[in-house]
A protein has these predicted regions:
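Intracellular effector-coupling site of seven-transmembrane GPCRs
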Residues: 135, 166-173, 183-188, 200-237, ...
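Extracellular TM2-ECL1-early TM3 structural module of rhodopsin-like
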Residues: 13-21, 25, 51-109, 116-126
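Hydrophobic alpha-helical transmembrane segments of polytopic
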Residues: 20-23, 27, 132-139, 224, ...
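Extracellular N-terminal segment of 7TM GPCRs
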Residues: 1-33, 37, 171, 180, ...
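Loop architecture of class A 7-transmembrane GPCRs
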Residues: 2-11, 81-92, 96, 119, ...
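Hydrophobic alpha-helical segments of membrane proteins
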Residues: 68, 145-152, 189-196, 225-244, ...
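Class A GPCR helix-loop hinge within the 7TM core
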Residues: 99-137, 202-203, 207, 286-293
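Intrinsically disordered regulatory tails of 7TM GPCRs
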Residues: 1-8, 137, 159, 250-258, ...
Length: 351
């Protein structure tokens, strides 16, 4: 939310605030119990967790940390910010860090799947070294480091009776350009290009999957990626509008004014979409779990995560067995035949 409130203008304020509160309220009511269910199910019922399930767990935690702040934002929009500026900065800092984490986790899901299919031996090494835990530590540290600028720029503003924690104050146009460019490049452009490349390269492999159950985790992750794009593109389009307004401020002041008006009008919508991205993933998991038969003691989503982990575990044993056989083999023909078959098997097995 860059430098403006959700909505300005006396005639539109009431409608905008009501709309914002309704959207954010729905995000909280749907996303919070949904992500809690995901976290509880994985921690309680999935003992052997594949890389995919671990990434989903961290994604649910990041989304949950964002969503639990929504009641305070709703109250603030409806009335006024009641806490200090330090609390405002701290909350926005945590939200930004968790949103960076969500973006990076979704990106890693795609890269990990790409490596597992296209470079199976590298994937085997990844699993043996248990590098994912170290990568997750680096990911969270990077997310909190990249969010430091909001501590400097975020501030309280507005009339005394309606102070809001939705403003960024930049010391110069240069600072704004640098920070918005970094946010869009690191937080969206690079991750989204990575997602497109990974799934573009895997498209032909995914098309070979004949059994719906074996395609489940791939379709699930693809759905998460698509929703990620739909929810985040508008936010970064607003960043581009801000950059364009700065670039044209001197030569085309009228165009700059129109861009700023468009930015102000769209901020409510883009802000709501960002929070929707944190609440929609559990819905996707439940939709993917709908075909799993469940007993009285097991839920469909529990069966989904167990299925993903069990197929990954079974595949990992198969892969390591293949590596061992390949090292002991003395015929290049058999090696070639086996190497040709493995990527297809990898694609057909859910991570």
């Amino acid at each position: 939310m860059n430098g403006t409130k959700f909505l300005e203008g006396e005639e539109e304020t009431d409608v905008g605030l009501v709309g914002a509160c309704v959207i954010l309220g729905l995000c909280f009511l749907v996303g919070t119990p949904g992500n809690l269910l995901v976290v509880w199910t994985i921690l309680k019922h999935v003992k052997q967790r594949s890389h995919t399930v671990l990434l989903i767990l961290h994604l649910a935690i990041a989304d949950l940390l964002v969503l639990i702040t929504l009641p305070l934002w709703i109250y603030s929009l409806a009335h006024s910010w009641v806490f200090s500026e330090a609390v405002c900065k701290a909350m926005v800092y945590i939200i930004n860090a968790c949103m960076y984490s969500s973006v990076f986790l979704i990106t890693i899901m795609s890269v990990e799947r790409f490596v597992a299919v296209r470079y199976p031996f590298a994937s085997a090494g990844w699993r043996r070294k248990q590098a994912l835990n170290k990568l997750l530590v680096v990911l969270w540290m990077a997310s909190f480091a990249l969010s430091i600028p909001v501590i400097v720029t975020h501030t309280l503003d507005g009339p005394p009776e309606n102070v809001q924690c939705t403003f960024r104050e930049y010391t110069s146009d240069t600072q704004e350009v640098v920070l918005l460019t970094l946010e869009t490049l690191i937080g969206f452009v690079i991750p989204f290009i990575t997602l497109v490349v990974c799934y573009g390269c895997l498209f032909s492999r995914i098309a070979l999957m004949n059994f719906k159950s074996k395609r489940k985790s791939t379709v699930l992750i693809c759905s998460v990626v698509v929703m990620f794009g739909l929810c985040w593109i508008p936010h970064h389009v607003m960043n581009l509008l801000s950059l364009a307004a700065i670039a044209l401020k001197t030569t085309y002041p009228k165009v700059t004014e129109n861009l700023e008006d468009a930015h102000t009008t769209m901020t409510l919508i883009t802000g709501a979409l960002v929070f929707i991205s944190s609440s929609v993933n559990p819905i996707l998991y439940m939709f993917a779990a709908r075909t799993f038969r469940s007993s009285l003691r097991e839920t469909g989503i529990q069966k989904l995560f167990q299925h993903i982990s069990s197929t990954a575990s079974a595949h990992g044993n198969k892969e390591l067995s293949f590596v061992s056989k390949r090292q002991n083999s003395h015929t290049s023909t058999s090696q070639c035949l086996t190497e040709t078959k493995l990527p297809v098997d990898l694609t057909m097995e859910a991570l």
